[in-house]
Amino acid sequence: MILTEHLSKRFGPLTAVADLSLEVGSGEIVGFLGPNGAGKTTTLRLLMGFLNPSSGRCSVLGGSLLTQPHLRRRVGYLPGDFRMDSAMTGRDLFRWFSRLRGGVEQNRIDQLVERLQLDPTRPFGALSKGNRQKIGVIQAFMHDPKVLILDEPTSGLDPLIQREFLSLVREAADRGVAVLFSSHVLPEVERMASRVAIIRSGRLVTLSSVDELLDRARHRLELRFADPVPTELFRDVSGVVAHEVDGKTVVITLDGPVGPAMQVASSRPGLLRVSPASDELEDLFVTLYGGAPSEDQHA
């Protein structure tokens, strides 16, 4: 229901998305992860038809939203920076979105307003970031779309409302809705997504189920040496799919026999200790990137 094939987008000399192929099927929830400027927001805007691809193609519900904008009525989209007319109230905005989509049952809107604890009578400009985000979430869900494309959807929401949002997403997936959401909050992705697509510098680094990623996290070793270790020590070693060097400590992620890595480690004088590394998904993310996850800059 959501598809990209060798999708690329360039802005002059900058490549924001490079040869990205990804598919999200009916009832599937895919978390889209990446550090600053990774290309997540650009990918979502390409899917929505707001940008022209430089090469490759993308489709939603079997068509291009760029050339078939009527398909947007069946898509729920939440941009990363949701802005509306500051004078319009929540009710005004819901009526406006309802007209755009050919009509929405008021009962559905009222239900979402109650679940997200929103006062729809206040003007948008007078609302906090969290309450503005609630309006964004409601407009994305209120017409019961077949596809949800959500950019940092829980930004600004308090923990209680975040839990309600997760329930809305799961309910949508149970109805067969395809969900693609970007996030930098790894526990959120771990709870909600069936698969995780990790992007860096516009390229897909990995596409795995959450269970597979956690399994990879459990196949990690921490090696402690007496002296600082060259960053290239475990490069191209069979079975080592990622490595992180921090002075005298190396964390390696294995996808195969441990023997070749241990042979390299033991061949270097001063190996002091080998122990299991953390099995947290966030630590695996850091190993894949060599840096901590952070908010997208909407590249």
Locations of regions flagged by a protein language model:
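ABC-family P-loop ATPase nucleotide-binding domain
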Residues: 1-8, 291-299
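ABC transporter nucleotide-binding domains
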Residues: 2-4, 9-200, 205-206
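Short loop/turn segments at beta->alpha junctions
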Residues: 89, 209, 277-280
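Active-site phosphate/pyrophosphate- and oxyanion-stabilizing loops and adjacent acidic/basic residues
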Residues: 95, 187, 211, 263, ...
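Non-catalytic alpha-helical coupling and interface elements of nucleotide-dependent molecular machines
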Residues: 99-102, 290-294
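ABC transporter nucleotide-binding domain
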Residues: 165-254
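Short, charged/small-residue-rich alpha-helical element at the C-terminal edge
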Residues: 219-291, 299
